[in-house]
């Protein structure tokens, strides 16, 4: 939209692969029962649970990037393990360590529990990954007068020193890391889940850190509601294993319909990805709005929505999804027979018109549809 207005803009997608593995998602535990040993290690150092090649981070990053091209969205990617370990953030880490008591005071303003001087003295806004066990189960016990060299101990029994000028295997705490990256990248706008948008939440706290520690005016922020999943259980969540990748969604949704769901929904209103019959309703609503757009009867809102979701180089043929499900089931998805049945039904769609939806209709019917459908 910004580029359409003649603005220079880029969409930055950050892989938080340098975060610690907190718990084992259900879908990961289902294929490997030994993953708990890696809790506390960064995702980029955790082995791939689904195969012999690459890491945990590699697997999910590759899955995402290989399917996101279907949406016609251009993104710049940042891999945080490379950024931290490459020393790109070193001067900001040093600054945060030097200003650790000021950071503590900012964090304390946004907490309900009363701060203590003992806690303030022992606070450090950074976690060191242990060179012996690879985990972040370390505690800084002292710091040099110039705030450059820390002495630390790890729960695994290892003791060591860490020079923030030359050692980079560490990561700032979230509410310091986030504003640091705003400064580094020159971020102007960033959305975030509604949990980050609460009063005294991540954004409220991070914007104060941004201004008072890094001297950077924080970006405009837009909170958004969580996305639901109908036909299964729970909200989208990476740690629960219920997350849906673009690849999984594209098995039943055309990319334009996914973009349309986002474009038509206000940020703080929820919507569901439907694995039940609700998906047929969504396709129907999409087709009706598309028809209004194409025949020139759409209002400005609908026109803007459709222009945001239609993908250059693709043409959407609005063959009714419920019709493909019903008739496809009758002829066992045999294409010549399906064309003949549609002709007799007075809906003479050809294979070229319905091929983009047919496989999705079949997959949904066989893998997702409720028993009564």
Segments and roles (model prediction):
Residues 1-8, 67, 127, 134, ...:
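A glycine- and charged-residue-rich anion-binding loop/surface
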Residues 1-104, 206-208:
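N-terminal Rossmann-like or analogous alpha/beta NTP/dinucleotide-binding catalytic cores
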Residues 3, 62-69, 94-101, 105, ...:
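A broad, structural surface signal
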Residues 21-24, 108, 141-143, 261, ...:
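Short, solvent-exposed loop/turn and secondary-structure capping segments
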Residues 34-39, 101-105, 156, 164, ...:
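Glycine-rich loops and low-complexity Gly/Arg-rich segments
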Residues 44-60, 107-127, 131-133, 255-266, ...:
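Hydrophobic transmembrane alpha-helix bundles
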Residues 73-246:
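Active-site cores that bind ATP or allylic diphosphates and position pyrophosphate for catalysis
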Residues 198, 203, 225-372:
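Catalytic adenosine-cofactor/nucleotide-binding cores of aminoacyl-tRNA synthetases and other
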């Amino acid at each position: 939209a910004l580029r359409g207005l003649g603005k220079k803009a880029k969409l930055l997608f950050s892989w938080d692969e340098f975060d610690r593995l907190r718990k084992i998602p259900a879908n990961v535990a289902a294929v490997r029962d030994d993953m708990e040993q890696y809790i506390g290690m960064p995702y980029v150092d955790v082995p791939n649970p689904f195969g012999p090649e690459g890491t945990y981070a590699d697997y999910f990053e590759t899955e995402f990037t290989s399917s996101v091209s279907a949406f016609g969205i251009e993104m710049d990617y940042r891999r945080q393990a490379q950024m931290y370990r490459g020393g790109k953030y070193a001067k900001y880490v040093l600054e945060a360590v030097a200003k650790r008591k000021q950071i503590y005071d900012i964090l304390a303003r946004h907490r309900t529990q009363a701060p203590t001087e003992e806690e303030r003295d022992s606070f450090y806004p950074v976690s060191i990954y242990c060179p012996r066990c690879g985990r972040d189960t370390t505690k800084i016990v002292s710091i040099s007068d110039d705030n450059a060299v820390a002495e630390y101990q790890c729960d695994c029994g290892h003791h060591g020193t860490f020079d923030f000028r030359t050692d980079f295997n560490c990561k700032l705490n979230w509410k310091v890391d986030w504003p640091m990256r705003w400064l580094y990248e020159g971020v102007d706008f960033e959305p975030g889940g509604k949990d980050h948008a609460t009063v005294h939440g991540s954004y409220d706290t991070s914007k104060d850190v941004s201004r008072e520690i890094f001297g950077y005016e924080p970006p405009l922020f837009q909170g958004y509601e969580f996305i639901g999943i109908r036909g299964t259980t729970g909200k989208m969540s990476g740690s629960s294993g219920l997350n849906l990748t673009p690849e999984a969604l594209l098995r039943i949704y055309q990319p334009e319909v996914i973009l349309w769901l986002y474009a038509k929904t206000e940020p703080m209103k929820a919507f569901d990805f439907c694995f039940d019959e609700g998906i047929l309703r969504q396709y129907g609503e999409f087709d009706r709005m598309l028809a209004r757009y194409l025949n020139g009867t759409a209002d400005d809102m609908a026109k803007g929505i459709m222009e945001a979701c239609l993908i250059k180089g693709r043409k959407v043929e609005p063959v009714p999804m419920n019709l493909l499900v019903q008739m496809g089931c009758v002829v066992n998805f045999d294409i010549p027979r399906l064309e003949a049945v549609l002709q007799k039904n007075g809906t003479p769609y050809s294979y070229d018109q319905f091929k983009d939806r047919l496989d999705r209709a079949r997959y949904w019917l066989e893998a997702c549809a409720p028993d009564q459908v």
